[in-house]
Design a protein with these regions (language model features):
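Preference for long, amphipathic alpha-helical scaffolds in soluble/luminal domains
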Residues: 1-197
């Protein structure tokens, strides 16, 4: 592999790129879901990208589907893991059509949409609603783009899966308005900071 050069069209029509990808697929196909945090759903996404949809993947997908009403965001909330679990389940459903995960997608999606701040962002803690019942501010060190973007992507993917919930469209709209502020100003910062240049 070290003696192979990348072709001018790399990664397309490139023997070295093809070899790297084939080797990566071998490694990914042998990995199991033993990690914590976002590592497992990201591994699941890598397996999906490699075309792996075996029983192990189905078992993992079903294992991260929360029962309806089981998420207690005021007690436990992890915006990163929730977002990546939902991205994985949505992509898994879109690729396989396995309806056994739709209730899980619905639960993650509704909880993430309800967790959003009035600006469409997520924080380290679940957003508490204001007295009138509308979304309040992100709290627990403030909002973070680093988890708000994956959560927003997961909500859009869930809608593509046919998941319906009254919070979905407003959540997409809130996040879109927030992120559009950064257009032509620089890259998205980690949290509520000036645009990165």
């Amino acid at each position: 592999l070290t003696n192979l050069a990348y072709s001018a069209t790399a990664p397309y029509n490139c023997p070295k790129s093809a070899r790297i990808l084939a080797d990566a697929v071998k490694v990914i196909s042998n990995m199991t879901f033993k990690s914590s945090g976002i590592a497992n759903p990201v591994l699941g996404l890598a397996k999906l990208a490699a075309g792996i949809t075996n029983d192990e993947l189905k078992t993992y997908a079903n294992s991260i589907c929360p029962a309806t009403g089981s998420l207690q965001p005021l007690v436990y909330y992890d915006s990163w893991t929730w977002a990546y679990n939902n991205i994985f389940l949505s992509e898994y459903f879109l690729l396989t059509g396995d309806t056994s995960v739709t209730n899980g997608i619905r639960e993650w999606t509704s909880s993430l949409a309800e967790a959003q701040s009035m600006y469409g962002t997520l924080g380290h803690h679940y957003t508490e609603n204001r007295h009138d019942g509308t979304h309040g501010s992100a709290w627990g060190y403030g909002p973070m783009h680093a988890c708000s973007i994956p959560a927003g992507i997961s909500i859009v993917l869930a809608k593509k899966c046919g998941i319906g919930h009254p919070e979905i469209d407003p959540a997409i709209d809130r996040l879109g308005k927030n992120e559009s502020y950064y257009v032509d100003k620089g890259g998205l910062p980690y949290g509520e900071h000036a645009p990165e240049l």
